[in-house]
Amino acid sequence: MQTSNTDYFFQSTAQLENAERKRLKSKNSNGEPIKLQSKVLAIAADPTRGDAVFLAESSGTARRLVLETGESAAVYKGPTAPLPCICLSTDGSTLYAGCWDRSIWSWDVKSRKPGHKFTGHTDFVKAVIYVNSGGRNLLISGGADADVIIWDVITGSRLHVLKGHTHKIQCLAADPIARAEGSPLTIFSASSGQGIQSFSITPSLGDTVLSDPFKVHETSIYKIFFDEDGDLWTASADNIARCLTRESGWKSETALEHPDYVKDIVVDEARGWVITACRDEEVRLWDRATGELHHTFSGHFEEVTGLLVLGSKVISVSIDATVRQWPLDPKEIQLAKAAEKEKEAGVEPAPEPAPESMLTEEEERELDDLLNDS
């Protein structure tokens, strides 16, 4: 392949071949891609409507996307640095996004006007969740500074800073069983270390104590996800996704092996699937009961960064700047398999060129380090 792009002269043969592979793969229309202008780093459900999602992007933009039409129903601006995490208030009225600028931005969903800007972390904000404890709505964030901060959503002030983590926080998740049984709200945290820790939020907040970590992986844990049974699913840079059962004291009962970093994991309760996102660009569908790989959805041409089960589909987002939708109904999956075989014998029409990055070369390297921090 001949090119006038001087960047090619500084790349190895393997790098050039990989770039060409991605260029060719970017032409596919698998998963009905919705194309955006910047890398998608996180996804969250819209609590008020089932056909829309919220996205956090590397450009510093958050948006509300209607999946059926591909229309951006609302765009939320202000940050000038990437947004690695996103969440909404329980009633869906307020949007929150953690940012590289060490703060958490908020917007009124309907008016798109900025709200409180939560400042207090000393490094990237990598995880943010909205919870209710004792009748009080709280925002909880985790950062690359290894701190967990509890915020007052009304005033935007810090209520408590939880120290004790020794590694960068990657993910936070609220324990649904403790909350349902009336016990104090318990939050689990995963980090760039090897373990998972937890803490219960007491009325005074000052009594909040971090548990000792329990080791389940060999390196960074990118995502933790509670299923309806209260068991904990994990995704890690050691190329394994695990199910840690509550009854066993959080021991691994299921291990799903991948060829590369596992970036996200979700469970489809209705149909018994476990879905994983991988750095190798694939979305994998596993049988929850047997732990066997059932199908691989191939379409993204860069790392898959997030997943969301929405009705009978799983939505995936990627740093290839696309949002894709994959079927979860067994009959539709069989049709997808058949269609995939047919495409292997044909040539797909070339779509629009992949959008160019809005980040500088240095920012691209920093973003890659952030996404694959192990």
What is each PLM-predicted segment?
Residues 30, 39, 49, 72, ...:
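WD40/WD-repeat beta-propeller blade-loop signature
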Residues 33-40, 76-83, 118-125, 163-169, ...:
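WD40/WD-repeat beta-propeller blade N-cap
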Residues 10-39, 69:
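A short helix->beta-strand "capping" segment at the edge of beta-propeller domains
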Residues 50-54, 74, 92-96, 105, ...:
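Structural hallmark of WD40 beta-propellers
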Residues 1-24, 261, 292-296, 301-374:
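Terminal intrinsically disordered, low-complexity extensions flanking WD-repeat/beta-propeller proteins
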Residues 43-50, 69, 86-93, 111, ...:
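Loop/turn segments within WD40 beta-propeller blades
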Residues 67-70, 109-112, 153-156, 201-205, ...:
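Short loop/turn segments that connect beta-strands within beta-propeller blades
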Residues 59-63, 81, 101-105, 123-126, ...:
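Short coil/turn segments within WD40 beta-propeller repeats
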